[in-house]
Every structure is written in structure tokens, then in C-alpha cells.
């Protein structure tokens, strides 16, 4: 039951183009004054910068 729910949720988010990808420093672009107020800016949007896995 839980697996079916998780699968349906993932399929729903993917079909809505809501996919969360970790942001690394290679993806960051220069910020404009009217860009998002938190995190860093990428060509796809903005979010928190992820550090290297330890």
C-alpha cells in the first residue's frame, strides 16, 4: 500500500515537472537584483547550494 502511494506521488510530481535536483556550484549563475531572495540562482530556478557529500 505504501509503495503504491509513493509511486503514485512520484509519478504525479514528475508529470507536473516538479522535480527536485541538488544544486552544485557548477550550476550557479550570476544573480540579478530581482532574483530570488534565498539560496543561489541557476538557469532552472533557485534554491539552497548543496555541499559535497562527506
From Swiss-Prot:
Induction (free text): Expressed in conidia an all stages of infection.
Keyword flag Lipid metabolism: no
Keywords: Disulfide bond, Secreted, Signal, Virulence
Primary role: Secreted protein required for appressorial penetration of intact host epidermal cells and for pathogenicity.
Top-rank lineage group of the source organism: Eukaryota
S-S bonds: 36-46
Residues in the signal sequence: 1-16
Changes seen on gene knockout: Impairs pathogenicity. Exhibits a defect in appressorium-mediated penetration in rice leaf sheath cells but neither in conidial germination nor appressorium formation.
Subcellular location: Secreted
Protein's UniProt name: Secreted virulence factor MC69
Main location class: secreted
One of the record's GO cellular component terms: extracellular region
UniProt source species: Pyricularia oryzae (strain 70-15 / ATCC MYA-4617 / FGSC 8958) (Rice blast fungus)
Family designation: Belongs to the MC69 virulence factor family.
